[in-house]
């Protein structure tokens, strides 16, 4: 499967802006057969760190844009209880992705934090299959805290369960990638320790928008894809136009992803003179190009921004 490389980017803006252009790091892998289990903190403190629900939006954006030929995604939402869950599911069709995203949106942030419970439950949902790699992505904004919880569990029990789950993952070759989210409450050494014990890594995502880059960074050695950041800027009110030049061959799918902490306005994506359908989910917008034509070397993207609106634009293939 051949890759493409961006050779030039010409951004034409009809209003003044202050861009922070960032060169994308490209990740390529030929791994196959991957089961990913997201274990995500839905405790009350997440209301402060993610007041606009962008963090779970970035998990949904990952589901919408990851190339899904041989990947299955599971999900556990926890606070001091297990709120929602599913074992790894195929996400090849729009309907499959919609079902998983509906589950992610089902509960609100509330309650205490029982990381040990969430991680243990996520591990139980990962079925062992010899031909598939298994990975857990643990997202939390703080250490276990069950003070005032009426579940009968204590912070000490949660920490012990966290340790035991990490040991089981090590024994079974399951990596735990942990993400310290937002203004992390506590010592991140706990997350770092359990990740490193499974030959994985801990990441920090200080802002919700940063989470998508962390997620794609985690899977750089587990999946066959490339991600490139086209722009990362603060824009004035008005219409913004991005003209992207491409060369060499593409893969069999290319995704355009726009992200903003504020609601994104109308987005138009033009490829080969045709406007592509887009899905606007508020804080992120996705446009898909299925089986790109190798002869087409241009892509145009148009969107409307508010005054001082932050906007990130990515190409994923």
Regions of interest found by a model, annotated:
Residues 18-30:
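Sec-dependent signal peptide cleavage junction
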Residues 50, 106-107, 112, 117, ...:
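VWA/integrin I-like adhesion module and closely mimicked acidic/polar interface patches used
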